[in-house]
Amino acid sequence: MKIKEITLVGIIVAIYVCLCLVMGNFSYGPLQIRIAEVLMILCIFDSRFILPLTLGCFLANLLGLLMGLNYLTLDVIFGSVATFVSGILMYRFRNIKFRNREILSMIIPGIINGIIIGIELALYTSNGVNISLFMTYFVYIFVGEILSTLFLGLLLYKPLQDISLYINEKF
């Protein structure tokens, strides 16, 4: 791995972590709007962003846990897995477009995080499987993700695309 690529990974990780920590409690828990998730849009443009964003999620969840913002130890692992799977699927489905935008790819993090984190929260807060609790958490997580990846993602689509093109040129 070249020094430029390592630098790029470090920058993406740092931006993701900083956005999570600056937003504090809004980035953690069942009712969250994790603004850093807008960076997931970068996965549409280049698969090289998947691992840095996964690492950023891992570190943000770990630091959140250590700071008392994130109360689930398992979220450090499952949240990171959800980010990794979302990034892969976003990249794989990037060619499916609606009105010249990758809307399906932008919705994927909401679905994946809603399922994985919804199950995690439902199991943590109840004894056994509770479908209605899972559905509640799924909706909470899904809506927060959609606000970040779809609505904010559409607003920042062009700048993020330009950043990705610049990075592809330079790195």
Predicted feature residues:
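Hydrophobic transmembrane alpha-helices
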Residues: 1-51, 55
